[in-house]
Amino acid sequence: EGAEDPSQENPPQDIPSQEDPDQAGTNSEGSSGSGLRAAGFLVLAGDVLKTAAACWFCWQAAPELGHTALLYGGLGAVLGHNWPFWNKFRGGKGVAVNCTWLILYLPITGALCCLAGGGAVLLSGYLPLGAVLIAALAVPVAWLQYGGESAFIMAVSASIMLTRHWAGLQRMRRGEEPQFFRKWHY
């Protein structure tokens, strides 16, 4: 009678034991806002600080580049977050890193892109939609503010976000993606 009932759902797993690293962060209690909120805030703070540090370092290392130093510092933070060498190139999806970078590089319009993506999440309930929208909106904004090089780098970032959130977008299309703020969307 001490044996577990195999018909019951599996209990939540720790992040390191997840089979799919893309799902690990998405389903972790800290990132989903349920359960370990303090851990989630620490992860968010770490993402914000490492992105700010990367941008600051590039600004200090090459001040003659001006805003372009922030452009490449942020891209480095996004790449390092999504594919960290110390974790066998398996990382997160980069939403907080991307938002921080946009706000540092395009302070007002970057914040508006983030707000638009957040609004899409609140209205639809789908996190992948907001994540991809944030990065996609930044491409024309960067073009208008700083030109082609900036737009190209933002397009690279948008492509990364699309790739990292592709599975969630496909689940959305099939009606299988869980909705964030589910209680608001019945």
Residue ranges and their predicted role:
Residues 1-5, 9-10, 19-37, 170-186:
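Cytosolic, membrane-interface loops and tails of multi-pass inner-membrane proteins
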